[in-house]
């Protein structure tokens, strides 16, 4: 209750009395971060943490574990189970707030870094291995169907064997964007790779990545990468010649 009162003015907060109740909420609601007490009835914080980290749809969520146990063994256990941060009680409210802000901001910064670059590689610490594999699979499906009229959120849900709401919840939590926005991002990042190769004209890249209008392609590309397609080509040609 103390944390709920101190966070609800800044964030949307969902509370649970124990780990089992929290897990039920997590399976139905999109959550950006979890703060859990280690000691709870029915299912304690460690068990909740383990279930979250072993669930493909939840494992991306940052997890803060609070505990009255001030021992190295307990801290190691929390980190081994996958906690992002282990905080001992009594804690400083300011420290908890700063930790929450930092974890959420780091997630935003990581995806912005990924989205603003042409390639599909992630920085090593941007996300966990399971999340990278999940996103790689989704990205592969989009790239295989870029020129297909059937490319849609429905196609992704079918190929990923997920409900529409589950796909939305996982992707939004992992990247901050909706499935439709991610499809557009993959189109543009693929376009940037093709343009950088120097093997295709802008018009060819436009249609190879599923855009039906050159002007719309140029507008979307400029918004995503901060330069027009022709300037992007020129910059990469200059880089190759100077290298």
Per-region residue spans from a language model:
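Two-component/phosphorelay signaling modules centered on CheY-like receiver
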Residues: 1-14, 169, 174
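Acidic, metal-coordinating helix/loop segments flanking the phosphotransfer/catalytic sites
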Residues: 15-33, 197
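Receiver (REC) domain active-site loop signature in two-component systems and cognate sites
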Residues: 40
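C-terminal output helix
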Residues: 91-100, 112
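Terminal helix-turn-helix DNA-binding modules in bacterial transcription factors
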Residues: 173-212, 234-243
């Amino acid at each position: 209750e103390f944390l709920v009162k101190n966070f609800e003015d800044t964030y949307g907060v969902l509370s649970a009395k124990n780990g089992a109740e929290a897990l039920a909420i997590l399976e139905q609601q999109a959550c950006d971060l979890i703060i859990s007490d280690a000691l709870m009835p029915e299912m304690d914080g460690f068990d909740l943490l383990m279930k979250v980290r072993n669930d493909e749809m939840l494992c991306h969520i940052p997890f803060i574990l609070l505990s009255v146990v001030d021992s190295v063994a307990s801290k190691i256990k929390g980190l081994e189970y996958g906690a992002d941060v282990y905080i001992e009680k009594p804690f400083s409210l300011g420290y908890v707030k700063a930790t929450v802000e930092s974890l959420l901001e780091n997630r935003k910064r990581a995806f912005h870094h990924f989205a603003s670059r042409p390639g599909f590689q992630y920085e090593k610490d941007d996300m966990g291995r399971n999340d990278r594999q999940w996103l790689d699979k989704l990205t592969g499906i989009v790239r295989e169907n870029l020129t297909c009229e059937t490319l849609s959120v429905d196609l992704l849900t079918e190929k990923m064997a997920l409900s529409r709401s589950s796909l939305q919840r996982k992707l939004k939590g992992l990247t901050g964007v909706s499935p439709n926005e991610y499809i557009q991002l993959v189109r543009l990042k693929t376009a940037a790779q093709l343009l950088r190769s120097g093997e295709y004209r802008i018009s060819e890249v436009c249609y190879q990545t599923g855009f039906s209008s050159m002007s719309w392609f140029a507008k979307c590309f400029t918004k995503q990468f901060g330069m027009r397609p022709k300037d992007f080509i020129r910059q990469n040609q200059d880089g190759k010649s100077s290298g």
